């Protein structure tokens, strides 16, 4: 899909509260498109790189609750707690299998452990394809099945129009 088609399709997925995954070569504008969408919607885009995290970072940090005799999980500070926005898992498939697996529940039910994604937040991910030789980890079915997948293709005329409109030379 061309960038303009991607933006339209991602907006439709966000409106329907369906997580979406953008696939495309490095540098074609996947991330920029998500930040453009966030700006148009006037919402925060929170960029999370699973490749920089451990599996426990998604679920949270274990904390004993001695009073109740249970272990609770303190959510990571990169996970939103209020407001509206797009939780953007950029370069999702650069993360190892265990770290990707830690996000399964978040993509399906919008929660993981004790953490629940606020109602005003949506999930978008992006990554490179195997043919891009980007050292990716193939996404397991349980994660892949929780998203709509869109192929992002570079389009020279659209890029030139974007560059001219934004003073890029």
Label for each model-derived stretch:
Residues 1-169:
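AAA+ P-loop NTPase catalytic core and its hallmark functional loops
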């Amino acid at each position: 899909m061309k960038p303009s088609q991607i933006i339209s399709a991602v907006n439709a997925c966000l409106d329907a509260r369906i997580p979406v995954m953008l696939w495309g070569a490095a540098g074609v504008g996947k991330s920029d498109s998500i930040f453009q969408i966030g700006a148009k919607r006037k919402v925060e885009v929170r960029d999370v790189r699973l490749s920089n995290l451990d599996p426990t970072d998604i679920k949270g940090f274990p904390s004993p609750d001695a009073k109740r005799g249970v272990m609770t999980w303190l959510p990571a500070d990169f996970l939103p707690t209020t407001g509206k926005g797009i939780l953007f898992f950029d370069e999702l498939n650069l993360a190892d299998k265990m770290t990707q697996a830690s996000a399964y529940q978040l993509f399906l039910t919008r929660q993981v452990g004790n953490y629940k994604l606020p109602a005003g937040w949506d999930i978008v991910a992006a990554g490179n394809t195997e043919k891009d030789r980007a050292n990716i980890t193939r996404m397991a079915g349980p994660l892949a099945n929780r998203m709509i997948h869109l192929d992002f293709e570079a389009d020279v005329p659209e890029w030139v129009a974007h560059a001219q409109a934004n003073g890029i030379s």
